[in-house]
């Protein structure tokens, strides 16, 4: 834009003298022409001459303005060139500074990378050492856990076997209880069906009675009409009434009679409905009582079962404690039962150290009870059943004459009672159905009295037969 302005200024400046020369030539030509006009006949008017002078003045003014603009544009161009030079210098300095900063940053990062590599190598070495240590430690713990797992699995199998046997007994008992409850439920259903049939029969009998009364009333009405000498075309009935009556009085009398009859029948119907509603309410009340009784008996049965389970649990705990006491007593007897054998000779017997004769029967227990230990706390419930001291006593034989109380005592029948079957809920019905079959016999496990731990009986001391002299 500045270049085009400068070109226009130069053109205008270059064209200024030419225009002036052309104008001068024109004026001279005009003057000459004036002289020649006089000679040649060409005349320039003064109006045209004034117009040309005005145009020349305007062109000169425009030329001055364009020259001023050219000067301003030249100044602007110089300022822009200086500014461009300054910007180039600033860019060179900024680039040099950026290169210095980049080199400094690269050096610092290289140092940090070297430090991190060294730290990484040290960490790798430490990690390998720690990993090796942890691997050895974990392998040792794994072997220990495997041994413990094998032992626990063995104990668990024994406990599971004991629990399975116990649960099988409980399942059999529950199956027997379920069968008895199903039989009771079937009996209640049959009783309900019988009650419904009885109710239907009573309703049918009531309807038949009402129909008989209606027939009887129709017959009485027919007799009364015959007595009054009224023409009876057909026996009037509530279902078939003849509306053809001779006089209005007979009609009114007949209407009053029918109204009275309807009122009486309505009263009978209301009484029958009231009686029926009372019976239904009574039956519903009986059914509600039976349901409540059934629910109460079920809750009582549940409480008895829970109580029986609790007592069985306490009994098993007491049996385990008795077994431990018996084992402890047996160990003490076997360890402290060294006394001389009683002989029949009056001469006192002095055993020699080289004699291989056993001193007393208690001494022979040592070979059997060396490896005997009371059960641990982990398998106290299950192992005591299998490692009971009764097994050692049976192994010793009956020649020693030791009598020990059995750890699993059979309860006497006077301490336990069999649960009686629930009474029939249909106690208010007139017809008593046959009682439900008793539940299958169960093992007595629930004492009737409060759960009391039976006192352990003291085992009898071994009796050694002594011959009289």
Curated annotation (Swiss-Prot):
Q: Which residues are annotated with the PTM Omega-N-methylarginine?
A: 380
Q: Where is the composition biased (Acidic residues)?
A: 1-10
Any coiled-coil ranges, and where? 47-320
Question: How is this protein named in the record?
Answer: Coiled-coil domain-containing protein 6
| Free-text domain note | The protein has mostly an alpha helical conformation similar to myosin heavy-chain tail that might adopt a coiled-coil conformation.
Q: Which domain of life is it from?
A: Eukaryota
Q: Which intervals carry biased composition (Pro residues)?
A: 419-444
sequence repeat copies, ranges: 99-127, 128-156, 157-185, 186-199, 200-228
Residues annotated as carrying Phosphoserine in the record are 45, 233, 237, 242, 247, 277, 316, 356, 360, 388, 406
Q: Name one GO molecular function term.
A: identical protein binding
Listed Low complexity bias regions: 344-361, 460-469
Residues recorded as bearing N-acetylalanine in the entry: 2
- Annotated Gene Ontology cellular component terms: cytoskeleton; cytosol
Q: Extract the ranges annotated as region (Disordered).
A: 1-37, 335-362, 394-469
Ranges for the region named 5 X 29 AA tandem repeats are: 99-228
**Which keywords describe this protein according to UniProt?**
Acetylation, Chromosomal rearrangement, Coiled coil, Cytoplasm, Cytoskeleton, Methylation, Phosphoprotein, Repeat, SH3-binding
Q: Which residues carry this modification: Phosphothreonine?
A: 342
Cellular localisation: Cytoplasm; Cytoplasm, Cytoskeleton
Give residue numbers for sequence motif SH3-binding: 435-444
Q: Entry's InterPro entries?
A: DUF2046
């Amino acid at each position: 834009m500045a270049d085009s302005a400068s070109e226009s200024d130069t053109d205008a400046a270059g064209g200024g003298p030419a225009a002036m020369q052309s104008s001068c030539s024109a004026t001279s030509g005009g003057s000459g022409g004036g002289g020649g006009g006089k000679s040649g006949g060409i005349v320039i008017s003064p109006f045209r001459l004034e117009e040309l002078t005005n145009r020349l003045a305007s062109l000169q003014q425009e030329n001055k303005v364009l020259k001023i603009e050219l000067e301003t544009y030249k100044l602007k161009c110089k300022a822009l060139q200086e500014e461009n030079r300054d910007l180039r210098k600033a860019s060179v300095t900024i680039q040099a500074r950026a290169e210095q900063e980049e080199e400094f940053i690269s050096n610092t990062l290289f140092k940090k990378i070297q430090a991190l590599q060294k730290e990484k190598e040290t960490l790798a070495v430490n990690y390998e050492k720690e990993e090796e240590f942890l691997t050895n430690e974990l392998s040792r713990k794994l072997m220990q856990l495997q041994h413990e797992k094998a032992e626990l699995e063995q104990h668990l199998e024994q406990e599971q076997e004991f629990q399975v046997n116990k649960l099988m007994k409980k399942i059999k008992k529950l199956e027997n209880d379920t069968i008895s409850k199903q039989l009771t439920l079937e009996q209640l259903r049959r009783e309900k069906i019988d009650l419904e049939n009885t109710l239907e029969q009573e309703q049918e009998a009531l309807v038949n009675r009402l129909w008989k009364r209606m027939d009887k009333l129709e017959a009485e009405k027919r007799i009364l009409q015959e007595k009054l000498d009224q023409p009876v075309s057909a026996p009037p009935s509530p279902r078939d009434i003849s509306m053809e009556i001779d006089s209005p009085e007979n009609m009114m009398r007949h209407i009053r009679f029918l109204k009275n009859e309807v009122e009486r029948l309505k009263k009978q119907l209301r009484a029958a409905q009231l009686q029926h509603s009372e019976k239904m309410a009574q039956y519903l009340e009986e059914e509600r009582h039976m349901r409540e009784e059934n629910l109460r008996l079920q809750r009582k049965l549940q409480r008895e079962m829970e109580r029986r389970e609790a007592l069985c649990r306490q009994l098993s705990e007491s049996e385990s404690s008795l077994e431990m006491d018996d084992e402890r007593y047996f160990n003490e007897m076997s360890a402290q039962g060294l006394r001389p054998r009683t002989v029949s000779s009056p001469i006192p017997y002095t055993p020699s150290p080289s004699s291989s004769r056993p001193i007393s029967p208690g001494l022979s227990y040592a070979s059997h009870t060396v490896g005997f230990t009371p059960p641990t706390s982990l398998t106290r419930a299950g192992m005591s059943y299998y490692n009971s001291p009764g097994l050692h006593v049976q192994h010793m034989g009956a020649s020693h004459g030791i009598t020990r109380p059995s750890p699993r005592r059979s309860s006497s029948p006077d301490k336990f009672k069999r649960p009686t079957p629930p009474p029939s809920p249909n106690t208010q019905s007139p017809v008593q159905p046959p009682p439900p079959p008793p539940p299958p016999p169960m093992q007595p496990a629930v004492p009737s009295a409060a759960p009391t731990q039976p006192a352990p009986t003291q085992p009898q001391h071994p009796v050694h037969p002594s011959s009289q002299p």
